[in-house]
Amino acid sequence: MKRLDQVLAADGVNAELELVIKDVMVACKDIAYKLGQGELAGILGATEDENVQGETQKMLDVISNDLLKDILVANPYVRGVGSEEEDYTIAGNADGKYLVTFDPLDGSSNIDVNLSVGTIFSVLEAQDDQSGDNQEVFLQNGRKQVAAGYVLYGPSSLLVMTTGNGVNLFTLDTNIGEFVLTKEALQIPEDTAEFAINMSNQRFWEPEMKQYIDDCLLGEEGPLAKRYNMRWVASMVAEVHRILIRGGIFMYPYDNRDPSKAGKLRLMYEGNPMSMIVEQAGGASSTGRMDIMDVAPQGIHDRVPVVLGSKNEVAKVVAYHTK
């Protein structure tokens, strides 16, 4: 089986970017180990702090964030890092070529009940000579990403990533401590009858999203003429992974609980990297009205509505929002 570094070399990834990705994996392997220890290591539960998003931080949120941040700012090729858990971007090497953004532990509300969580990351090229602690250097749309991926910590630890040449899946071989290639060129089925959404928020959605879900629930007799199944794990990494393997559509739409927020999920840490992965696997991603990766970020913590997965189903949701 091919190791990660062999696959990156075959894809023509340069040595600098390869080292950045490998450092992300060093941190993720450490996170996987700590998650496996769980209560034995005394690292479950919440802190008394909130992150910049206003969310109570789990202890493993903080630990995972520090592992990724510390190894990346020490990398000679990293200009700066941005994290969902940090108020501001952080400078790395002034001569670094790359910027890395990440959600250190997506779905962390699942930790204490031993359900799947994950790490999401995105790599951009620094476009000018500004320092990495200036967020302006990060404000590029998702089309500018040179790599994106996630690590799913489940029964096995899986890396799914793209450098713009398709999507590959790697499994962490704990015997050798390396991610090895186990599936190549993942492709999302174009059609689906499975959706993932948090139905408890339905009363807050826009009318277009309400109508789409209502039509899904009408089954074969409804306008969509399908019997749909619903899934919800409360972990974007787990939801997207299921879609990559068997198809489906994931939605976290705009809701009106806080009109000042464009959505729940963060563009730079979740929307863009997951959109790159999904589109590279033949799927589609949208806010409901435009492609997520075409959204111009105004701030490092911008939020965005998310609809992604099997491309024909995403097109149906977009049609509801644009007719």
UniProtKB/Swiss-Prot annotation:
Annotated GO biological processes are: fructose 1,6-bisphosphate metabolic process; fructose 6-phosphate metabolic process; fructose metabolic process; gluconeogenesis; sucrose biosynthetic process
Swiss-Prot/TrEMBL cofactor(s): Mg(2+)
The entry marks the following residues as binding substrate, namely D106, G107, S108, S109, N198, K264
Q: Key word Cytoplasm present in the record?
A: yes
Q: Which UniProt keywords apply?
A: Carbohydrate metabolism, Cytoplasm, Hydrolase, Magnesium, Metal-binding
Enumerate the catalysed reactions.
beta-D-fructose 1,6-bisphosphate + H2O = beta-D-fructose 6-phosphate + phosphate
GO MF annotation, one? fructose 1,6-bisphosphate 1-phosphatase activity
| Cellular compartments annotated | Cytoplasm
Detail which positions bind Mg(2+) 2: D103, D106, E270
EC number(s) in its UniProt entry?
3.1.3.11
- Quaternary form? Homotetramer.
- Family membership noted in the UniProt record: Belongs to the FBPase class 1 family.
Q: What is this protein called?
A: Fructose-1,6-bisphosphatase class 1
In its UniProt entry, the species of origin is given as Hydrogenovibrio crunogenus (strain DSM 25203 / XCL-2)
The record's gene field reads fbp
